[in-house]
Amino acid sequence: MNNFDDILEQPAEQEAPAQENPKRKLEWWQIKEQKQRKEAYATLDRIFHEFSEGKGDVQGYLDTHGRFDRYSARNALLIHEKCPNAKQIGNYKYWESQGVDILKTEKNNPIIILEPGNTYRRKDGTTGQNYYAKEVYDISQTTAQGQEQPKVALDERLLLKALIYKSPAAIHVVEQLPDGRRGALYQPEQNSIFVEKGMDAADIFRCVSQELAKAQLMAVNPEQLPAECGNKAFCVSYMLCKKYGIDTR
């Protein structure tokens, strides 16, 4: 057993647009926000259409979402569309608090994301969520450009332990997977993930993260088959690898 196998053997709807009162005269900033919000939704509609036709930059989006995993998928799409190489974003007040200024040439070129606002009652009695447009800027649009945050070296054992913490399926290390498979395999009938013995940390992270994603997706929707959530699981694994510096090869 190598230095990593023992770790694995441990118990282990588009929202409705914000409702405006047509009788109320809007201020200039409200008109601006309304325009930005409509443009953001139009951008998302275009991106979704491109994805549906197999023309969108899916890998680029996943790269961006891997860096901004705390943002919604929708906002990650908007960030990627406007600034695909974005590393660190914040609104005007955030950068001001950091002692950083927005470049004059970039002040009128913000990244627009959608933030939740007030809820409202629909005609059918259900509750809806309003969203408003928010201006943010990447560090490359500020006087702090080029001052990237240093990368933190992560301990491989701790990273693997974090990956399998509260796993939705039992994990077992085996000498060989069935049918000559390599890496890892989720078996829903046994609710177990079987992992090939002897892999290095990067290989373990890549294959186990994908099978963990399958297990979690099937826990949410038990009716689907492992093959039906394969693409989603791959995307989850890819983003995790990008986030933690694991080669996605």
Model-derived regions, located:
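N-terminal accessory/interface modules of nucleic-acid-binding and processing proteins
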Residues: 1-249
